[in-house]
UniProtKB/Swiss-Prot annotation:
One of its GO terms (molecular function) is RNA binding. This is 23S rRNA (guanosine-2'-O-)-methyltransferase RlmB. The gene is rlmB. Transmembrane segments: none annotated. It is an enzyme of class 2 (transferase).
Amino acid sequence: MKKQDIIFGIHAVEALLKHSPERIIELWLLQGREDERLTPLIRQAKAFGTSIQVTSRKVLDEKAESTQHQGIVARVKAAKILAEHDLDELLAKTDLPFLLILDGVTDPHNLGACLRNADAAGVQGIIVPKDNSVGLTAVVSKVACGAAETVPLFQVTNLARTMRHLQEKGVWIVGTAGEADCELYQADLKGPLAIAMGAEGKGLRRLSRECCDTLVSIPMSGSVSSLNVSVATGICLFEAVRQRRS
């Protein structure tokens, strides 16, 4: 198990300072960079007694393993990994669960975008399989723009078993499939809900599909056969939001 991680990008570090400042071990800043957005972050980091180093772009690129760090990189204590047994605590806190299941999403940009969508829609937790899925990497946190610190991510060893457990707890699981007869806008998404999305191209795996209470499709009018998983996720989540508010 990793004890430390790297986080980079203004929004990612800002969210960490707001929600879990105790996790930040050290902060590296780009020498000579003048950006008003960095000033309050530096002030907060100093208030928490965080070690701050000013360094070159080459060093930041190496530490972030990316050039998209916006002049700020943090070495942090690894986030707590939530598992299947932690779901019961989450479910006990709400009468109307709203969850997202991502089956086989291995691209960090897609997971980051899904986290951002989930945060905006008010999703209470995202469930991913421990294998065949990307974890909370630095790129995921950067793309998520802070949502990696606000939306709990549950990594489970057996996704089908977890889905059945959710059903036993009264959660209705709606999966997506391009060939499904029921369209998204015809489905009832008002109650305790988990929306299950598959990887782009492959879709939900067979066992995951079999564990869904119903399958829905997103109506498509053009010539393309599928959408990016983060786009499809946003469409499904906000249709649920619309219904739950009406």
